[in-house]
UniProtKB/Swiss-Prot annotation:
Organism: Mycobacterium marinum (strain ATCC BAA-535 / M)
Active site location: 81, 177, 179
UniProt record similarity statement: Belongs to the glutaminase PdxT/SNO family.
Enzyme Commission number(s) from the entry: 4.3.3.6, 3.5.1.2
UniProt keyword Hydrolase, yes or no: yes
Protein name per the record: Pyridoxal 5'-phosphate synthase subunit PdxT
Reactions it catalyzes: aldehydo-D-ribose 5-phosphate + D-glyceraldehyde 3-phosphate + L-glutamine = pyridoxal 5'-phosphate + L-glutamate + phosphate + 3 H2O + H(+); L-glutamine + H2O = L-glutamate + NH4(+)
InterPro entries assigned to the protein according to its UniProt record, in alphabetical order: Class_I_gatase-like, PdxT/SNO, PdxT/SNO_CS
Underlying gene: pdxT
Amino acid sequence: MSIPRVGVLALQGDTREHLAALGEAGAEPMTVRRRSELDAVDGLVIPGGESTTISHLLCGFDLLEPLRARLAAGLPAYGACAGMIMLASEILDAGVRGRQALPLRGIDMTVRRNAFGRQVDSFEGDIAFTGLDHPVRAVFIRAPWVERVGAGVTVLARAGDHIVAVREGSVLATAFHPEVTGDRSIHRLFVDIVNGKA
C-alpha cells in the first residue's frame, strides 16, 4: 500500500509535534487549513489546543461543515485532548454562547471539557491501552474525559475511573497528548487505521 497522506488541522494547537510524530509513524504528513487540503488527505489529526478557538476558526475558514461531511462519509480521524472534545457528538461545559466548542460528531460520545481541572492540575502517568502491548505515557493538560459512549464505541484506556481513550470505526480519540512523549504507538495505530490494517 502507498504511504497515506495524513493531515493535521493547523488552525491552532500543537501542529508541529503531530506532523513529526506522523512522519515517524510512516505517514506523509501535511497541514490542513483549507478545503482543498482537507479534500486531499486520507486521514486527519485534530490536535490539542483550545476547543472553542478551534471551533471559531473552523467556522472562519469555512471548514466546519466540510469536515463534518467528510467524517460522516468515513474519513479516518484522530483527536488529542481538544481534538477529542471536537470529535464528540455532545460537549458538556462547551463554553459561553457565541464562543462554544462545536461538536463534529465523529464519535458517539459525551465529553466534558477541562474535566481534570485547570492548567496547574495537569499531570502525566503510564496507562494501559487496549491493543498495545505496553503502557502508554499519557500527558494530561487541562484534559477532558468521556462521560458517555454509544454502543458502537470501544473504550481503549482509562485514568482511574475516567474514560480517556476511545475508538468508533476509523475515528480515534485520546484525552492526553502522545505527541509530546516520544512514544509513537498511538500515531502508528492511527496510521494503521488509515491504511485499513487496524
